[in-house]
């Protein structure tokens, strides 16, 4: 993937409902692979406290407790993805948050195809540059977006990458 503009990073999360189904998980990974450069990937299980911290901005909302319980109910997968306009592209691929709406207005989206309910809607994605920075730091505290942009982004933008099947991420191709 060769790009003219600087690459943008975003966070993508595959939620526990999709992780529970290997065929759905594989389909989601393939869609991501077809559309993005995968910078980092991590499988994890949250404690309830992790979920409460991540979704703190929704504390007090009617869905907060249900969301917290669900996100700590099983494994999930987090990705750092890169491409031009990565945030917008991932959000478009996900489709509307409300699964009922996604099924009728955007059936080709990930939530339209695989979502079950508004909480069990298969995916999460950052909605702005600021939230992407914050969310990437939450899931990948060891990752420095600034350092990556300075040292690695030019190589990725120019297409000097290779996909590692074992780790399921892209790396800089050393020639």
UniProtKB/Swiss-Prot annotation:
Residues annotated for ATP binding in this entry: 15, 63, 91, 97, 111, 121
GO CC terms in record: mitochondrion
Catalytic activity: a 2'-deoxyribonucleoside 5'-diphosphate + ATP = a 2'-deoxyribonucleoside 5'-triphosphate + ADP; a ribonucleoside 5'-diphosphate + ATP = a ribonucleoside 5'-triphosphate + ADP
Membrane-spanning ranges: none
Organism superkingdom: Eukaryota
EC number: 2.7.4.6
Cofactors named for this entry: Mg(2+)
Keyword Nucleotide-binding: yes
UniProt cross-references to SMART domains, sorted A to Z: NDK (SM00562)
Key words of the record: ATP-binding, Kinase, Magnesium, Metal-binding, Nucleotide metabolism, Nucleotide-binding, Transferase
CDD domains from the UniProt entry: NDPk6
InterPro entries: NDK-like_dom, NDK-like_dom_sf, NDPk6, Nucleoside_diP_kinase, Nucleoside_diP_kinase_AS
Active site (record annotation): 124
Regions annotated as coiled coil: none
Keyword field contains Kinase: yes
GO molecular function terms attached to this record: ATP binding; metal ion binding; nucleoside diphosphate kinase activity
Biological process per Gene Ontology, one example term: CTP biosynthetic process
Role: Major role in the synthesis of nucleoside triphosphates other than ATP. The ATP gamma phosphate is transferred to the NDP beta phosphate via a ping-pong mechanism, using a phosphorylated active-site intermediate.
Family: Belongs to the NDK family.
Name of protein: Nucleoside diphosphate kinase 6
């Amino acid at each position: 993937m060769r790009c003219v503009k600087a690459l943008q990073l975003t966070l993508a999360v595959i939620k526990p409902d999709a992780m529970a189904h290997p065929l759905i998980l594989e389909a989601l990974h393939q869609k991501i692979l077809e559309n993005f450069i995968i910078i980092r990937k991590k499988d994890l299980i949250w404690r309830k406290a992790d979920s409460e911290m991540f979704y703190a901005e929704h504390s007090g909302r009617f869905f907060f407790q249900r969301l917290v319980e669900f996100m700590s109910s099983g494994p999930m997968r987090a990705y750092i993805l890169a491409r031009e306009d990565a945030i917008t592209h991932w959000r478009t691929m996900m489709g509307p948050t409300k699964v009922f709406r996604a099924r009728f207005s955007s059936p080709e989206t990930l939530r339209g195809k695989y979502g079950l309910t508004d909480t069990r809607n298969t995916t999460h994605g950052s909605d702005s540059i600021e939230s992407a920075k914050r969310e990437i730091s939450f899931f990948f505290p060891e990752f420095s977006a600034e350092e990556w942009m300075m040292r690695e982004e030019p190589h990725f933008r120019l297409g000097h990458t290779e996909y590692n099947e074992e780790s399921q991420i892209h790396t800089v191709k050393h020639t």
